[in-house]
Amino acid sequence: MDKFTSLTGVAAPLKITNVDTDMLIPKQYLKTIKRTGLGSGLFAELRYREDGSENPDFVLNKPAYRKASILVAGDNFGCGSSREHAPWALLDFGIRCVIATSFADIFYNNCFKNGILPIVVSPEELEKLMDDAERGANATLSIDLDAQEIRGPDGGRIRFEIDPFRKHCLLNGLDDIGLTLEKGVHIDAHEQKIEGRRSWL
């Protein structure tokens, strides 16, 4: 998993509440267990028309937001089923941070496991960030994970909270496998100890 220390990028405003995982990545894209290639299916029912052409009115299809790496969204983001394809699709598209007033628990946890930073802010702070994001090409936000700050284009700063363990994992690029490998020396020592006691294994 790639480390997340800081991020400066275009923020796309998604003024939709209760964005569920089916909206994030529709069921027809769930046939794969690969984490790559899902970016094209992100928000597919909103991004594409019935004939397969792009919907020019959807925010991520607008020229200013095609390279967005931050998503500023509405309340209860990521609700619905537990499909891990949802954060996979966000990551494959290039989204590394989602800012909202609340997240569904399973989606929130899955974000951390896949190197995405979900940030919870107050309604007032979200309104300010939405205004910043609507500046289009100038909609650049900076995220400093170590300082736990969002910095706007006007120099304003918003502090956010994050669990220390999750912060440690993101800063060091540690997913579940990485956390296990951190204990590799202890695991090897345990295996050798067990092998000596249970030679028949």
From Swiss-Prot:
It catalyses: (2R,3S)-3-isopropylmalate = (2S)-2-isopropylmalate. GO terms for biological process: L-leucine biosynthetic process. InterPro entries: 3-IsopropMal_deHydase_ssu, Aconitase/3IPM_dehydase_swvl, AconitaseA/IPMdHydase_ssu_swvl, IPMI_Swivel, LeuD. GO terms for cellular component: 3-isopropylmalate dehydratase complex. Pfam families: Aconitase_C. Keywords: Amino-acid biosynthesis, Branched-chain amino acid biosynthesis, Leucine biosynthesis, Lyase. One of its GO terms (molecular function) is 3-isopropylmalate dehydratase activity. PANTHER family: 3-ISOPROPYLMALATE DEHYDRATASE SMALL SUBUNIT, 3-ISOPROPYLMALATE DEHYDRATASE SMALL SUBUNIT 2-RELATED-RELATED. HAMAP family: LeuD_type1. Belongs to the LeuD family. LeuD type 1 subfamily. Heterodimer of LeuC and LeuD. Catalyzes the isomerization between 2-isopropylmalate and 3-isopropylmalate, via the formation of 2-isopropylmaleate. This is 3-isopropylmalate dehydratase small subunit. It comes from Methylocella silvestris (strain DSM 15510 / CIP 108128 / LMG 27833 / NCIMB 13906 / BL2).
